[in-house]
Amino acid sequence: MTKILAADDSVSIRQMVSHTLKDAGYDVETANDGSDALKKAQATKFDVVISDVNMPIMGGLELVKALRGNPQYKFTPILMLTTETSAEKKQQGKAAGATGWLVKPFNPDTLLKTLKRVI
């Protein structure tokens, strides 16, 4: 079963992502910020990481850079799920190593299609 780590500081977004993915048959663990996600990713190998960009303590772009610095996550798909729509932020995400970019509010079907594309 594909293991997914979803990081977002919004409880409602974490719940929506978790329910959407669990209903589709994925094993999902959530984190409330980038620091929490990084700790969980160091303890458990995930097949995919989904992260918000703007979070307290450690943001999503910092998380991507930290994960890409770990050989275990060098080729792991990392999707950003965010309200950020600027070309500059998307470029920063790509430069950090993000695999894809989804904008909130998101359509659950779009999330699932994007996930299937990167796995």
Where are these regions (language model features)?
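Charged docking surfaces used in two-component/phosphorelay signaling
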Residues: 15-23
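Short hydrophobic/Thr-rich beta-strand motif most characteristic of the beta2 strand and flanking loop
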Residues: 25-32, 40
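Active-site beta3 strand of CheY-like receiver
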Residues: 45-50
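Active-site residues of response regulator receiver
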Residues: 52, 82
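Receiver (REC) domain active-site loop signature in two-component systems and cognate sites
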Residues: 55
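Short, glycine/charged-rich "phosphate-handling" switch motifs in NTP-dependent
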Residues: 99
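C-terminal output helix
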Residues: 106-115
